């Protein structure tokens, strides 16, 4: 149970998550990180089983590093998404219980966002929410999303979306993590102090 959000802005991609880690209805951790840097130009959020998440993320990070060494350039995001799709598809019947949002900026597609489900299905999205809080987050996204959002506007929208989930979903809570990925700055975390101002304790 969690909430993860991805948004494509005109100048980059925003990924946001809550910080609560649950095991059923038990709150296992209150400061979990659910956004992972794969390379300077791409990151992923995942919801699902922690052991499966760690395994899939290690494969993704390794593949990105291998590609950079072999080709002397960053891996195209679509290639990385195809890799995780095949990994999940061919793991059947012993599936990885993960639901992924992969987003970033590359030379081929610019700002781009993909969703990969636990069976390996890939969809390209302008905005997406996953996890138990996704119905509440999607409502906020659908009301306010525009294709001409700046990165700062997309950050504000992502925070509103996760905040809506935290208010209504018992599986989401404890604060918000936000990451931006742009061509100029690459992977960058939004500071915790900003999160505390937006979500007072």
From Swiss-Prot:
Q: How is its activity regulated?
A: The formation of the proteasomal ATPase PAN-20S proteasome complex, via the docking of the C-termini of PAN into the intersubunit pockets in the alpha-rings, triggers opening of the gate for substrate entry. Interconversion between the open-gate and close-gate conformations leads to a dynamic regulation of the 20S proteasome proteolysis activity.
Against PROSITE patterns, the record matches this protein to: PROTEASOME_BETA_1, PROTEASOME_BETA_2
User: Single Gene Ontology BP term?
Assistant: proteasomal protein catabolic process
Write down the EC number: 3.4.25.1
Q: Fetch the InterPro entries from UniProt.
A: Ntn_hydrolases_N, Pept_T1A_Psome_bsu_arc, Pept_T1A_subB, Proteasome_bsu_CS, Proteasome_sua/b, Proteasome_suB-type
- Name any GO cellular component annotation: cytoplasm
Q: Which domain of life is it from?
A: Archaea
* UniProt keyword annotations, A-Z: Autocatalytic cleavage, Cytoplasm, Hydrolase, Protease, Proteasome, Threonine protease, Zymogen
Q: Name one GO molecular function term.
A: threonine-type endopeptidase activity
Pfam families under this entry? Proteasome
Family membership: Belongs to the peptidase T1B family.
What the entry lists under PANTHER family is as follows: ATP-DEPENDENT PROTEASE SUBUNIT HSLV, METALLOPROTEASE TLDD
The record's function comment reads:
Component of the proteasome core, a large protease complex with broad specificity involved in protein degradation.
**Full protein name:** Proteasome subunit beta 1
Organism, scientific name = Pyrobaculum calidifontis (strain DSM 21063 / JCM 11548 / VA1)
């Amino acid at each position: 149970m969690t909430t993860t959000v991805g948004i494509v802005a005109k100048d980059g991609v925003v990924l946001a998550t809550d910080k609560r880690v649950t095991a059923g209805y038990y709150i296992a951790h209150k400061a979990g990180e659910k956004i992972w840097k794969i390379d300077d130009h791409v990151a992923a959020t995942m919801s699902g089983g922690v052991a499966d998440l760690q395994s899939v993320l290690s494969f993704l990070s390794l593949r990105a590093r291998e590609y950079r060494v072999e080709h002397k350039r960053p891996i195209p995001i679509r290639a990385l998404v195809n890799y995780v799709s095949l990994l999940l598809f061919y793991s059947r019947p012993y599936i990885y219980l993960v639901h992924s949002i992969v987003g970033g900026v590359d030379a081929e597609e610019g700002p781009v966002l993909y969703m990969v489900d636990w069976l390996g299905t890939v969809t390209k999205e302008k905005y997406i929410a996953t996890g138990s809080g996704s119905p509440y987050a999607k409502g906020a996204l659908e009301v306010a999303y525009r294709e001409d959002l700046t990165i700062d506007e997309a950050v504000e929208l992502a925070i509103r979306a996760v905040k809506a989930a935290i208010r209504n979903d018992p599986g989401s809570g404890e604060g918000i993590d936000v990451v931006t990925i742009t061509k100029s700055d690459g992977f960058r975390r939004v500071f915790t102090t900003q999160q505390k101002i937006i979500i007072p304790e």
